[in-house]
């Protein structure tokens, strides 16, 4: 494991900045940053921004100087790099384009489409969200694309699956005292509030299907021949099958979503969720989903469960 730093070349705040990364572990990177006295606010998803006047000090503490190109190459190889499209400003542009494409070739009013998409994205960017945010929305949409390219069926209307992805966490209160599935029920109600606007020209049967799919994400248990449900469920659970480092980021973000819950209550509730997932049948219901993510997901879930019990 190595902490790397590139030359200061990124201008901001009257100086230039280097990037400080680890080629193996975010835990290693954070530990190094704490020891060096770097502010947590300097961390940006996969790196710390370091002003030029501190670079020599960090090299003396053990950071290895490399070129910018080498730093990016090794960060990407580690699996820790957060793609540029996932950063907020670029991500939101990508999402807006994806939303607009769902209405291309229909009778929908462009202004109504833009307004509905903007309102939905505002919900996804609420300040209390850490995991259930636009990055998760984009990941689900990209996973739907991946599964479709790999041969998974989308059901009778591929647009319905993608619309359901947009709505599946559109309402997210994160209230542990609420009945199970309340957020999904409220999100399904939002489907009907938004998509029945005649200016969006969404057929009634598509609205019904989108609402059904959103409700399904409460349990992730689609019926055996529910192709659309299987695709959306698998895309929503894709995060479980990522690398151990990416999975750790997911768990940390979910914990932030429940920061108001005590550690003891978190461990108890999270343990129950993990047990239910581990005791279930296949986590993924499409053949491509099982092939790509099942084994890694079970390793990640088992490792987290063991850590909670330690």
Where are these regions (language model features)?
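Histidine- and acidic-residue-rich, metal-dependent catalytic cores
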Residues: 123, 184-223, 275-277
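Short, well-structured alpha-helical segments
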Residues: 113-121, 134, 138, 158, ...
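Active-site flanking loop/helix segments enriched in acidic
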Residues: 114-144, 170-176, 284-285, 289
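Alpha-helical phosphate/pyrophosphate-handling elements in metalloenzyme active cores
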Residues: 125-160, 186-199
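His-Asp-centered metal-binding catalytic motifs of divalent-metal-dependent phosphohydrolases/nucleases
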Residues: 140, 158-176, 187, 212-218
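An amphipathic alpha-helix signature
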Residues: 96, 100, 114-118, 141, ...
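Divalent metal-dependent phosphate-bond-processing catalytic cores, especially two-metal-ion Mg2+/Mn2+ enzymes
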Residues: 77, 82-102, 131-132, 142-157, ...
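Basic nucleic-acid-binding interfaces
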Residues: 9-66, 70-72
């Amino acid at each position: 494991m190595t902490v790397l730093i590139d030359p200061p070349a990124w201008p901001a705040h009257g100086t230039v900045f280097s990037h400080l990364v680890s080629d193996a572990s975010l835990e290693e990177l954070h530990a190094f940053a704490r020891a060096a006295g770097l502010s947590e606010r300097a961390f940006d998803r996969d790196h710390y921004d370091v002003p030029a006047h501190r670079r020599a000090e960090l090299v003396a503490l053990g950071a290895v100087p490399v070129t910018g190109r080498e730093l990016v190459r090794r960060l990407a190889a580690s699996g820790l790099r957060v793609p540029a499209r996932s950063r907020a400003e670029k991500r939101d542009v990508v999402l807006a384009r994806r939303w607009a494409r769902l209405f291309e070739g229909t009778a929908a009013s462009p202004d109504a489409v833009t307004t509905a998409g903007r309102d939905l994205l505002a919900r996804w960017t609420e300040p209390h969200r850490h995991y259930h945010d636009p990055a998760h929305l984009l990941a689900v949409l990209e996973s739907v694309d991946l599964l479709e390219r790999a041969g998974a069926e989308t059901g009778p209307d591929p647009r319905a699956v993608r619309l359901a992805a947009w709505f599946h966490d559109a309402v997210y209160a994160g209230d542990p005292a609420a009945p199970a599935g309340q957020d999904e029920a409220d999100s399904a109600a939002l489907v009907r509030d938004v998509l029945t606007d005649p200016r969006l020209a969404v057929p009634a049967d598509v609205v019904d299907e989108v609402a059904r799919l959103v409700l399904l994400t409460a349990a992730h248990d689609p019926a055996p021949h529910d192709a659309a449900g299987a695709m959306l469920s698998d895309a929503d659970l894709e995060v479980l099958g990522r690398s151990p480092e990416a999975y750790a980021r997911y768990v940390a973000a979910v914990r932030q979503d429940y920061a108001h819950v005590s550690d003891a209550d978190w461990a108890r509730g999270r343990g129950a969720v993990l047990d239910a997932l581990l005791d279930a049948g296949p986590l993924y219901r499409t053949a491509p989903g099982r092939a790509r993510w099942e084994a890694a997901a079970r390793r990640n879930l088992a490792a987290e469960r063991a850590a909670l019990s330690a």
